[in-house]
């Protein structure tokens, strides 16, 4: 339990994610740096439970988590929307045919006032790509839904040996409220 939870404050979304990952034995975390995911990444780095790898590209992160799964270790790939845009080939040629329960946590960009046209275009294609690949995906918009969705997505991915994507809405991460770009 964190100090601020002990003091009566609610857990932050990133504290909940860390707790649920640990409860479900997800030890390996790969990520490409992202401002929205920075609070989660900082907490994960601070916790000796996790093995953390920061590859150069999201495709490498997928390969690392896939290899770890084949060796008996559970892992997750953290990325932003534009990073997901680089993954369809790796998903279609490695993850899906091999039935790898790849967990992806994606910070959603390109919506709710994001002014970067590239992010907007990628955001519009992300869910259709996930759906066309039959990858279970759910957006998390409220702190009270974090535990339920993350827990269920992890369990479902491993029970069905299928990839799963958890999309962190700006409504959850507060990016849209603070005018971040």
Model-derived segments and spans:
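Thiamine diphosphate
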Residues: 1-181
